[in-house]
């Protein structure tokens, strides 16, 4: 895709508007959450020690929807209404879940209906494997259930990474950049703009969540479910890309790429749910067995945990990219991503639990690294905290 000034403006202006709107709305949402006592209270499985406002997702989604509306004004050929409507609906569902805790079954049904709405209104489906296993176009009877399964899986995988400060927002910002790069290579300016809008909307929340003290909020289900819907749109848009836009990119494994970007959330979710089922529990029952809980147990700070897991995910993407540059087949690219995903979740987690129990040398090495991730609130950190907290509106 040729970069023109018009294209740059279509990307930068909506993203800037999204960032400013998210910055502006944050203190007002924070005040409402405190006044109405919409907070996440500490308990045995939570990592925080004090109640934290849980409407951060509202600020993020407000920024995203503001950016989408501005893009509709600037981009004459864009039609993001189905995405806009889907995000708005799941935002309401997420807010209800944050306040009254909907049952997993109810949420699951709503997610399926929402995905069906997206399929019917946008036409996006996994209808082409682009040469993976020698398969190109697939039957609509396979495409529809596969798309529903993939989208609901993505929504729940993203929903389950909201465990430590900076993880969900940091991971999704980095992923938006990666998706944006792929959309750019595929010549899809609308999706490049959407990826930029989402990343820009997340930035203010990330700063408050990581550096803020009185301005800190959690993103909540309203945020993670909304991001899950948007990431589903990203994945299906990439996989359903016109083959002509990929004709000059031989052996570009877009399915391995999307799995690489989503690797840690997807494989960690599969691992956790598998363990729960084996133990006779509901796959949706909450516990402290996610990858981020392991890093906290090893003594890592929240930001240290977030950066470590994001770094692991970037390593998977780098391995996929190296496989692509080496000219490996699309099948080989997928197998490499799957093997690494299994190793850093299904193998790494139980291995480290054994190291913790036996207090081995490897355990002490990780603990030493974890201890180094803790920072005192001085210098840059104190400056960032003051900047984040200065917007707080007194009750």
Q: Where do the language-model regions lie?
A:
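Transmembrane alpha-helix boundary signature
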Residues: 66-78, 96-102, 119-133, 239-242
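Membrane-embedded alpha-helical core segments of multi-pass
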Residues: 88-93, 110-125, 146-156, 172-178, ...
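Alpha-helical transmembrane segments
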Residues: 2-32, 37, 61-89, 168-381, ...
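Juxtamembrane helix-capping/reentrant segments at transmembrane boundaries
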Residues: 41-53, 216
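Membrane interface segments of multi-pass transport proteins and intramembrane proteases
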Residues: 98, 128-138, 321-328
């Amino acid at each position: 895709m040729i970069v023109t000034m018009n294209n740059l403006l279509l990307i930068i202006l909506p993203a800037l508007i999204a960032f400013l709107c998210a910055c502006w709305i944050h203190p007002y949402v924070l005040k409402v959450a405190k006044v109405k006592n919409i907070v996440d209270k500490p308990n045995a499985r939570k990592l925080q020690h004090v109640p934290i406002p849980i409407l951060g997702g509202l600020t993020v989604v407000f920024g995203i929807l503001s950016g989408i509306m501005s893009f509709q004004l600037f981009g004459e050929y864009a039609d993001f209404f189905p995405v806009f409507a889907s995000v708005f609906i799941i935002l309401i569902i997420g807010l209800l879940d944050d306040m009254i805790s909907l049952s997993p079954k109810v949420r699951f049904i709503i997610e399926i209906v929402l995905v069906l709405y997206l399929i019917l209104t946008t036409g996006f489906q996994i209808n082409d494997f682009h040469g993976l296993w020698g398969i190109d176009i697939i039957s609509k009877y396979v495409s529809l259930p596969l798309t529903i399964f993939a989208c609901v899986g993505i929504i729940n995988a993203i929903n389950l990474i909201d465990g430590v400060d900076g993880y969900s927002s940091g991971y999704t910002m980095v992923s938006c950049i990666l998706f944006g790069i792929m959309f750019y290579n595929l010549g899809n300016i609308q999706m490049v703009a959407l990826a930029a809008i989402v990343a820009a909307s997340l930035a203010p929340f990330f700063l408050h969540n990581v550096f803020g003290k009185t301005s800190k909020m959690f993103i909540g289900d309203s945020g993670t479910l909304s991001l899950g819907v948007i990431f589903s749109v990203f994945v299906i848009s990439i996989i359903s890309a016109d083959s002509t836009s990929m004709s000059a990119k031989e052996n570009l494994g877009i399915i391995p790429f999307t799995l690489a970007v989503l690797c840690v959330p997807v494989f960690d979710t599969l691992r956790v749910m598998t363990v729960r089922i084996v133990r006779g529990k509901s796959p949706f029952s909450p516990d402290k067995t996610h990858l981020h809980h392991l890093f906290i147990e090893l003594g890592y700070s929240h930001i240290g945990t977030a950066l470590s897991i994001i770094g692991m995910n970037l390593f998977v993407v780098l391995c996929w990219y190296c496989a692509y540059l080496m000219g490996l087949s699309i099948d080989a690219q997928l197998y490499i991503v799957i093997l690494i995903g299994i190793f850093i979740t299904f193998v790494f987690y139980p291995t480290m639990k054994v190291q913790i129990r036996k207090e081995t040398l490897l355990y002490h090495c990780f603990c030493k690294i974890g201890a180094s991730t803790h920072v005192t609130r001085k210098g840059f950190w104190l400056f960032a905290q003051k900047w984040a907290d200065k917007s707080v509106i007194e009750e």
